[in-house]
C-alpha cells in the first residue's frame, strides 16, 4: 500500500499502465470516496523538468464535464514523488467498451453519438484554452454513468498535452502509433528524419481514427499482419490514402490495399447518420495538413449534426428503415429532400402514412412540430411508382473456424470473435423481425388506403352517373318540348350535345366494370388480399431472437472461461481437458447459431421479401388503375358540366321565344295552328312543360338524397377521413 497525506491505494489495485506512469484506484482517507491516483515511474523522471510539470499545469487550466477532473497534486509519503489525484471513472475506458464482444462491429448509434458529442465538447474546451492533447485514442477516453443513466465520456491522460495555438507548430513526438498522423508516424515509428513540423490538427487525425474505431469496432487502416507487425505497410496505407477515403485494408499478404469511402455494412450506424459523418471522417483523416479541416470547421459541422433531431421513416415498398437527421428549423420541403436523398423517391411522389392514416404536412410546418416517431412507430413513405425492394442492409458473416490444436491465446481470440458474431446475429435477427413487423403493419394500412381510394372513385363515379342521367333526361325533355311547342327543328348543336352526353354515359358505364375489377382484387379471395403477411416471414412467436440470445449466453460463458485460461498461461491436465470439451461445445453452439440465423431468420426474411415484390407490383397496377379511373371520371364530369352549361344557355335563349308577346306569338302560331283550339293546345303544352320542370326538380332532390346516403358507404362500411396535421 502507498499513500499521500490525504489518499491511499493498493499497488495491486491497478486501473491502467502507461509508459511513464501507473494509475491506481485510491480512496480519500477521511471520506472513503474513490479516486484515480496517477503515480509516475522512474522513466517519467528522466524527462526534462518542464516536461514533467507540463501535465500538472495543463490539468490546472481545465474544468469541463468531458475532461477528467484534477482534485489534488500531492507527494507520495515514502518517495516524495508527485502524484495526481483525479476523478475516478468506474466504467473503464472507451477501449474497454469496444473490446466487449457486443461492440465487435461498432457501438450502437445512440452510444456513438454520445461518444462523439462528448469528445468534440472536450476537444473544444482544450482548443479554447490553447491546448493540444497529442494522444487521443479510445484508451484515453474514460466512461462513467450519469445521473440520467446515460454514458458520459471524458478525455484523460494529458501527459503528452501542451499549450499550442492554432497557428503554432511543434516538432516533439508523442502518441500511440495506430492513431498517429502519418507525418508523426514516419518519424516516431519508422525513425525516418524529416524537417516537417506539426500543428494542432494532428489531433484531428487521431479523433478520426478513434471515431472510425467506435463506429465499426475496427481500426480504419490495417495491414494484413496487423498495424504493429508490418509498420512499413501501415505507413504506406496512411501516407498514401486517397482524398475521400476513410479506410484502407490489406486482405492478403503482399496484397493490394482496398480503399473505401464508406463505412462497412456491419456498422451499427443508420445511413442517415453515415451520410453526415462520413464527410467529417474523410476531411479529418487527411494526411496533407493543408487539405485537412481546421478545428473551427470541424466543430461547426459536428455540432450541426448533434443539434439535429431524428425523424424515423420507413420506406414501405423498399422495405428499408431510415433515420432522417433534420434541423429543428427545417420545413416540410427540406424533409422531403432529405427523404429523397435516402430513398430516391422524388418529393412530389412521396405519400406519407402515420399511425394508419394519411399524413398531410403543411409546407410551412417546422420539423420540431412533426409527429413524434420511434424505430417501432415511424412515418411510412410510399409512392405510386414502382421502386426496387431493397431490404435491410447487412452482411451474412460466417462463424470463424477454430483451429484443431490446443493454444490458449488462439482459442481465447477465436472465442471472442465467435461471441462477437453471435452478438451480431442477435442484433440483425431483431432488426429483421422489426422490419417485417413494420411491413405487415404498412401493408395492412396500404390495403385500407386502396379501399379508401376505391370508395372515393365509386362515390365520384356515382355522382357523375347521376349528373349524366340528369343531363340526358333534361336534354331529351327539352328537345321534345321545344319541338312540340315551337313546331320547328332544334339547332344542330343541341343534337350534338345530346349525342355527346350519350357517349359520355357509355364511357362512364365502362368505368363501372373497371371498378368492379378492382373490387374483386381487394375483396376476400382477390389477388391483393394481404392474408399472406400473417404466414410468411419471421414472427415474434417463433422466438428466434430469444433462441439466439440463449446460444449467445452459452457462447459468452465459454469465452469468459477462455479469457481466464489465457490469463493463467498454463493449465493443469484436468483443466486442459475441460478446456478442450468447452471448445467442442463452443463450436456446436456456434454452428446452431449460424443455422438458426441463416435458415430461420435470413431465409424466411428473403421469402417474405420476394412475396413483397410480387404483391407490390400488383398494388402499383391497381393504384394506377384507380388513378386512371379517377382521372377519367374527372374528365367526364368536366365535359358533362360543359354540356349542362350549354343546355342552360340554350334554355335561356329559347324562353323569350316561347313566352313572346301575343302579337309576336300570333305571327308565329297562326301558320302552325290552323285549328280553332290553338289556345287550348298551347295551354296544355305550357302545363306539360310546368309538370316536366317540377319533375326535374323532384329528381334533383332525390339525387341529392341518394348522394348523402352514399357518402357513408365503403367496401367495408368504414369510410376514413384524411388526417391533416
Swiss-Prot record:
One of its GO terms (biological process) is innate immune response. Residues 635-709 form a coiled coil. Serine/threonine kinase that plays an essential role in regulating inflammatory responses to foreign agents. Following activation of toll-like receptors by viral or bacterial components, associates with traf3 and tank and phosphorylates interferon regulatory factors (IRFs) irf3 and irf7 as well as ddx3x. This activity allows subsequent homodimerization and nuclear translocation of the IRFs leading to transcriptional activation of pro-inflammatory and antiviral genes including ifna and ifnb. It is found in: Cytoplasm. Residues 9-306 form the Protein kinase domain. Comprises A N-terminal kinase domain, a ubiquitin-like domain and a C-terminal coiled-coil region mediating homodimerization. It catalyses: L-seryl-[protein] + ATP = O-phospho-L-seryl-[protein] + ADP + H(+); L-threonyl-[protein] + ATP = O-phospho-L-threonyl-[protein] + ADP + H(+). It holds the Pfam family TBK1_CCD1. This is Serine/threonine-protein kinase TBK1. Residues 309-385 form the Ubiquitin-like domain. ATP binds at residues 15-23, 38. Belongs to the protein kinase superfamily. Ser/Thr protein kinase family. I-kappa-B kinase subfamily. It comes from Xenopus laevis (African clawed frog). The active site is at residue 135. The gene is tbk1. Its main location: cytoplasm.
Amino acid at each position: 500500500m502507498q499513500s499521500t497525506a490525504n489518499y491511499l491505494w493498493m499497488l495491486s489495485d491497478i486501473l491502467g499502465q502507461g509508459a511513464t506512469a501507473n494509475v491506481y484506484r485510491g480512496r480519500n482517507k477521511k471520506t472513503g470516496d474513490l479516486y484515480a491516483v496517477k503515480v509516475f515511474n522512474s522513466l517519467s523522471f528522466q524527462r526534462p523538468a518542464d516536461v514533467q510539470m507540463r501535465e500538472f499545469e495543463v490539468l490546472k487550466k481545465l474544468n469541463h464535464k468531458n475532461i477528467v477532473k484534477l482534485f489534488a497534486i500531492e507527494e507520495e509519503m515514502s518517495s516524495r514523488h508527485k502524484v495526481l489525484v483525479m476523478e475516478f471513472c468506474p466504467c473503464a475506458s472507451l477501449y474497454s467498451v469496444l473490446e466487449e464482444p457486443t461492440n465487435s462491429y461498432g457501438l450502437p448509434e445512440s452510444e456513438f453519438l454520445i461518444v462523439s458529442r462528448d469528445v468534440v465538447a472536450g476537444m473544444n474546451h482544450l482548443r479554447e484554452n490553447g491546448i493540444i492533447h497529442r494522444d487521443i485514442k479510445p484508451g484515453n477516453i474514460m466512461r462513467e454513468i450519469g445521473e440520467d443513466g446515460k454514458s458520459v465520456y471524458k478525455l484523460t491522460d494529458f501527459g503528452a498535452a501542451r499549450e499550442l495555438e492554432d497557428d503554432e507548430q511543434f516538432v516533439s513526438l508523442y502518441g500511440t502509433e495506430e492513431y498517429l498522423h502519418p507525418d508523426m508516424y514516419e518519424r516516431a515509428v519508422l525513425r525516418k528524419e524529416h524537417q516537417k513540423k506539426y500543428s494542432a490538427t494532428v489531433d484531428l487525425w487521431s479523433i478520426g481514427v478513434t471515431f472510425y474505431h467506435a463506429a465499426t469496432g475496427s481500426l480504419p487502416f490495417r495491414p494484413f499482419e496487423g498495424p504493429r507487425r508490418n509498420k512499413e505497410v501501415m505507413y504506406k496505407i496512411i501516407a498514401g490514402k486517397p482524398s475521400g477515403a476513410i479506410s484502407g485494408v490489406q486482405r492478403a499478404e503482399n496484397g493490394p490495399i482496398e480503399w473505401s469511402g464508406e463505412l462497412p455494412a456491419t456498422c451499427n450506424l443508420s445511413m442517415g447518420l453515415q451520410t453526415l459523418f462520413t464527410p467529417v471522417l474523410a476531411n479529418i483523416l487527411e494526411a496533407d495538413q493543408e487539405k485537412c479541416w481546421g478545428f473551427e470547421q470541424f466543430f461547426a459541422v459536428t455540432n450541426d449534426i448533434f443539434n439535429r433531431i431524428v425523424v424515423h421513416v420507413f420506406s414501405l415498398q423498399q422495405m428499408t428503415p431510415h433515420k432522417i437527421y433534420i434541423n429543428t428549423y427545417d420545413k416540410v420541403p427540406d424533409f422531403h429532400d432529405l427523404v429523397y436523398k435516402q430513398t430516391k423517391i422524388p418529393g412530389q411522389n412521396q405519400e406519407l402514412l402515420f399511425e394508419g392514416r394519411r399524413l398531410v404536412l403543411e409546407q410551412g410546418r417546422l420539423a420540431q412540430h412533426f409527429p413524434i416517431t420511434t424505430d417501432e412507430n415511424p412515418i411510412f413513405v410510399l409512392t405510386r411508382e414502382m421502386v426496387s425492394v431493397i431490404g435491410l442492409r447487412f452482411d451474412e458473416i460466417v462463424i470463424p473456424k477454430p483451429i484443431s490444436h490446443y493454444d490458449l491465446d488462439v482459442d481465447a481470440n477465436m472465442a471472442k470473435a465467435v461471441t462477437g458474431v453471435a452478438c451480431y446475429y442477435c442484433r440483425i435477427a431483431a432488426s429483421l423481425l422489426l422490419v417485417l413487423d413494420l411491413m405487415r403493419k404498412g401493408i395492412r394500412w396500404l390495403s385500407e388506403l386502396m379501399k379508401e381510394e376505391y370508395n372515393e372513385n365509386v362515390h365520384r363515379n356515382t355522382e357523375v352517373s347521376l349528373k349524366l342521367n340528369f343531363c340526358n333526361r333534361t336534354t331529351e325533355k327539352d328537345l321534345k318540348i321545344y319541338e312540340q311547342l315551337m313546331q320547328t327543328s332544334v339547332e344542330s348543336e343541341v343534337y350534338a350535345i345530346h349525342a355527346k352526353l350519350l357517349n359520355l354515359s357509355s364511357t362512364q358505364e365502362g368505368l363501372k366494370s373497371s371498378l368492379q375489377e378492382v373490387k374483386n382484387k381487394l375483396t376476400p379471395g382477390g389477388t391483393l388480399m394481404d392474408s399472406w403477411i400473417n404466414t410468411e416471414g419471421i414472427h415474434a412467436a417463433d422466438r428466434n431472437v430469444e433462441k439466439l440470445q440463449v446460444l449467445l449466453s452459452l457462447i459468452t460463458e465459454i469465452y469468459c472461461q477462455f479469457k481466464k485460461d489465457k490469463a493463467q498461461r498454463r493449465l493443469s491436465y484436468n483443466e486442459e481437458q475441460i478446456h478442450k470439451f468447452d471448445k467442442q461445445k463452443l463450436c456446436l453452439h456456434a454452428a446452431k447459431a449460424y443455422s438458426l440465423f441463416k435458415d430461420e431468420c435470413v431465409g424466411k426474411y428473403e421469402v417474405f421479401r420476394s412475396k413483397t415484390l410480387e404483391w407490390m407490383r400488383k398494388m402499383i397496377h391497381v393504384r394506377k388503375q384507380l388513378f386512371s379511373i379517377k382521372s377519367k371520371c374527372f374528365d367526364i364530369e368536366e365535359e358533362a358540366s360543359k354540356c349542362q352549361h350549354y343546355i342552360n344557355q340554350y334554355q335561356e335563349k329559347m324562353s323569350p321565344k316561347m313566352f313572346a308577346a301575343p302579337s309576336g306569338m300570333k305571327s308565329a302560331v297562326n301558320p302552325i295552328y290552323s285549328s280553332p283550339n290553338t289556345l287550348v293546345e298551347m295551354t296544355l303544352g305550357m302545363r306539360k312543360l310546368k309538370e316536366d320542370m317540377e319533375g326535374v326538380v323532384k329528381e334533383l332532390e332525390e339525387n341529392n338524397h341518394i348522394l348523402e346516403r352514399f357518402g357513408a358507404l365503403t367496401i367495408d362500411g368504414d369510410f376514413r377521413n384524411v388526417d391533416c396535421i
